Design a protein with these regions (language model features):
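Active-site-adjacent loops and short helices of periplasmic peptidoglycan-processing enzymes
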Residues: 1-86
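Domain-terminus/edge residues, biased toward the C-terminal soluble/receptor-binding domains
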Residues: 61-62, 77-220
Length: 220
């Protein structure tokens, strides 16, 4: 875990958050970004959480409330934090547009180097919790577990350029969430069909099927 006085880059903190689910890394990132948002803030973490909720709302997440940066919901963090499968999928879709995030969640293992308060450097190795990574088009994901939420997992799949985002909430065991994820992805790709919206021998100048004939006077 991170100790007071440790120094690391934002990307290293992101790796510590996303690969081994480091709640300490989530807090560090929240405090750092919160101060960037408002240098005068007296509570950088609260400033960051406020920005989280505002960003979620802009994405169309109507069923989400964040109360802390790491997602824990018990003891000192107990409250009304919640989300939905739909909202988590929206957030995953948006996050996967970021190249750094995309590369981090696609990492099977990684390491970060942290400079301690005494100036010494020490390395931390990390292994992903995503046991599906690299299988059947799985290109990344994030686990989450609490007693109230159960075993959760959101992931991204890409098969032949068709990318989808899956969300499993409140699964019964850590293994079951991965089984459910694979089943969900396989169902989608197995039931996907291509439907021709035009069936005609006539083609337009660029080779596409002719959809309709409209007289020149109809355009005026």
């Amino acid at each position: 875990g991170l100790l007071e006085g440790d120094e690391l880059t934002v990307e290293q903190a992101l790796r510590g958050l996303m690969i081994p689910s480091g709640n300490d890394a989530a807090t560090v990132l929240a405090e750092y970004v919160g101060k960037k948002i408002d240098p005068k803030t007296k509570n950088a973490e609260a400033t960051f959480v406020k920005a989280m909720n505002e960003r979620a709302k802009k994405l169309g997440c109507t069923g989400t409330v964040f109360e802390n940066p790491h997602g824990l919901d018990f003891d000192e963090w107990a409250g009304d934090m919640h989300s939905t499968a739909h909202d988590v999928a929206l957030m995953m879709q948006e996050a996967m547009k970021n190249d750094t995030f995309r590369e981090v969640v696609a990492s099977e293992d990684s390491w970060i180097e942290v400079t301690g308060a005494d100036g010494s450097d020490h390395s931390h190795s990390m292994d992903t919790h995503n046991v599906l990574l690299g299988q059947d088009g799985n290109i990344g994901g994030k686990t989450g577990t609490t007693d109230d939420a159960g075993y959760c997992f959101t992931s991204a799949y890409n098969r032949d350029g068709d990318e989808i985002y899956t969300v499993i909430l409140n699964s019964t065991t850590t293994d079951q969430r991965f089984t459910d994820t694979a089943t969900l992805a396989n169902w989608y790709y197995g039931h996907k069909v291509t439907v021709a919206i035009a069936n005609t021998q006539e083609k337009t100048a660029n080779g596409n099927p002719l959809m309709a004939r409209i007289s020149q006077t109809d355009w005026t």
